[in-house]
C-alpha cells in the first residue's frame, strides 16, 4: 500500500478534526477501501503529531474512525490492511494509531484476535514497543500500555510459537521490569498492574513451551532467569505480586500469579526473594482463599494448596517463629473434612494435595505441639 501525499494547511485542532471527519466520510466502494485507508493513515502520519498528543485525543480520533463509514464498509478488510501496514511502517504516529485500534477491537472482534494471534505479529509488536517505553513521554507510553495489553491478550488467548517467544528477549523483559518498578514507585497502579499481568502471561508461555518440548528443544524462561539474577529488582516484583494477588478478583489472573509463585518457590535461586513480612501477608491470603473459594473454582483452590507446599517448605517461613500455624492447619483440615467423603476425582486430587501440605516437616512438629497432629 502506498501512502498518498496531499498538502493541508492546518492552523488548529478544530481544522484537524474537520479534515479527519471529511476523510472518513468520503464514499468508497469495497474495491477502493485500500485507497481510503491509505489517505487516512497518510494524514495521521503527516499531521497527527500536534493534535494526537494526549490519551484523550488518541481515543477521540479512534472512536471517530471506528464509527466511520470507511471502517464500517468492511471492518475485517480494514483490520487486515492495518495488520499488513504494521509489518512495514516505521512512522511512530501511524503505529500508535494502529495499536490503539487493535487494542480496542481485539476484545470484541474475533477476526482481529485471530489476525493478531497468528505467528509473526508478536515479534513486530515487540520491536515497535521498544520505541514507546519512555514513561516521561505521555503519548508514547500510552501506546506502550496499549501494546502491552495486546501482548497480554494474545498470550491469554493462545500458545505462542517458539519464534514468537524468542522475540521476547532479555532487553525487552528488563525494560518491562524497569517500567513496572517505575510505575510502582510512582504509585501508578494501573500501569504497574498491566506490566505485571503481561510478565505473568509471558511466564506462563515459557512454562507451556517447556512442557510441550519434552526436552526436544530448550527455550530458557527469561522471566525466571532475570528474577534469579541481579538484573532486575525482584523485591519490587515480589511485593507487587502479593499486592496484586490480595486484590485480584479474576480467577484467571490469580492462577497466573500462583503459577509464578510456584516457580519462585521451587527454584533454589528464588526461594527467598520475598521479604518475610510479604510472606506473612501471602499466608494470610492463602488462608482466606482456601477457606472461601467456592466449589465451582476447585482448580483455583487446588492451585493455592499446591503452591502452599513449597511456600512452607522452601521459604524463610520454615524457620521459627512460625506465622499463624493453627490457622493454616485449620484451613487445610476444613478442606479435608469437606472433600473426604466424596468419590469425585477432583475432590480426591484436592484431598491428596491437602494431606501433602500437612506433611510439611516443620508443620507436623508444630501440629504435635498444638495437639492437632493427624
UniProtKB/Swiss-Prot annotation:
Major location (coarse): cytoplasm
* This protein's UniProt keywords: Cytoplasm, Nucleus
Q: Which InterPro entries match?
A: SPIN90/Ldb17, SPIN90/Ldb17_LRD
Gene Ontology terms, cellular component aspect?
actin cortical patch; cell division site; cell tip; mating projection tip; nucleus
Q: Which Gene Ontology molecular-function terms are recorded?
A: Arp2/3 complex binding
Q: Where in the cell is it found?
A: Cytoplasm; Nucleus; Cell tip
> Which cysteine-cysteine pairs are annotated as disulfide bonds in the entry?
none
Q: Which GO terms describe its biological process?
A: actin cortical patch assembly; actin cortical patch localization; Arp2/3 complex-mediated actin nucleation; endocytosis; protein localization to actin cortical patch
Q: Which family does it belong to?
A: Belongs to the LDB17 family.
Q: What biological function has been recorded for the protein in this entry?
A: May be involved in protein-linked oligosaccharide phosphorylation.
Report the protein name in the record: Protein dip1
To which species is this protein native?
Schizosaccharomyces pombe (strain 972 / ATCC 24843) (Fission yeast)
